């Protein structure tokens, strides 16, 4: 069983890390994308990614500094470098070393630049969302660039499993890089809804954090069966069987009265 997460825009390279990084799987492809990005001016980057002038300048500098060979001075394990809502829920900094080792074998972070990352893969600072329409030799966007690569990787990771399963905790933008026609695994989606205005609905901020919490739950509980995901109860969420299906698990939270 593999769990998929989206990356985060915010990055943390200030907090020290205690674990060694591993080499990303698709460094060559990432280096080729960096070369394309290096041809862009700050104005072009701002327009391409809808960024402020300051953020565009920061990322142009990041592209210039990026190196094909990551080391402890220019990189950090991905799961400890990403710093958004999902990663607040995951809270990888408080995971024990055995937990991080388990995550390395069961968690995959999708990335516009790196394609697919294991949690401890060395991440250099960058900004390149999967939905960016960055023209490249493979086509008009990053979905064309990555093609079957990510799907083939997920198949390879579970090639020895009789009943492979991918638990999708990523956003639609990122999961779109996984080609369902190529992927051999069963896909299970987890949906998180909160009670608001008299109805249950997906609230983006809460749902993102809940995806990270579910990843943490899977890691700490060593989840290997879809049925065991139903026990997720962090932050007040509970499995809602009446509105769930075999491949769509819904978790709901109602505020305390």
From Swiss-Prot:
It comes from the Bacteria. GO terms for biological process: response to hydroperoxide. It holds the Pfam family H2O2_YaaD. GO terms for cellular component: cytosol. Signal peptide: none annotated. InterPro entries: YaaA. NCBIfam families: PRK02101.1-3. HAMAP family: UPF0246. Belongs to the UPF0246 family. This is UPF0246 protein Lcho_2652. It comes from Leptothrix cholodnii (strain ATCC 51168 / LMG 8142 / SP-6). The lineage of its organism: Bacteria, Pseudomonadati, Pseudomonadota, Betaproteobacteria, Burkholderiales.
């Amino acid at each position: 069983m593999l769990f998929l997460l989206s990356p985060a825009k915010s990055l943390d390279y200030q907090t020290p890390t205690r674990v060694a990084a591993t080499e990303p799987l698709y460094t060559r492809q990432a280096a080729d994308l960096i070369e394309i990005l290096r041809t862009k001016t700050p104005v072009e980057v701002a327009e391409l990614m809808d960024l402020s002038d300051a953020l565009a300048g920061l990322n142009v500098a990041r592209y210039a500094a990026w190196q094909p060979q990551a080391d402890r001075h220019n990189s950090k394990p991905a799961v400890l470098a990403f710093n958004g809502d999902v990663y607040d829920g995951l809270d990888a900094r408080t995971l024990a070393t055995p937990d991080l080792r388990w995550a390395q074998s069961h968690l995959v972070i999708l990335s516009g630049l790196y394609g697919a990352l294991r949690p401890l893969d060395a991440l250099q600072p960058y900004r390149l969302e999967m939905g960016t329409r960055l023209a490249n030799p493979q086509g008009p966007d990053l979905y064309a660039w990555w093609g079957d690569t990510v799907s083939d990787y997920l198949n390879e990771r579970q090639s020895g499993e009789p009943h492979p399963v991918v638990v999708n905790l990523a956003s639609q933008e990122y999961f779109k890089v996984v080609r369902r026609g190529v992927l051999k695994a069963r896909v299970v989606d987890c949906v998180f809804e909160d009670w608001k205005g008299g109805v249950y609905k997906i609230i983006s901020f809460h749902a993102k954090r809940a995806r990270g919490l579910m990843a943490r739950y899977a890691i700490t509980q060593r989840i290997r069966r879809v049925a065991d995901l139903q026990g997720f109860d962090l932050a007040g969420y509970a499995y809602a069987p009446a509105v769930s299906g075999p491949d769509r698990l819904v978790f709901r939270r109602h505020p305390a009265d």
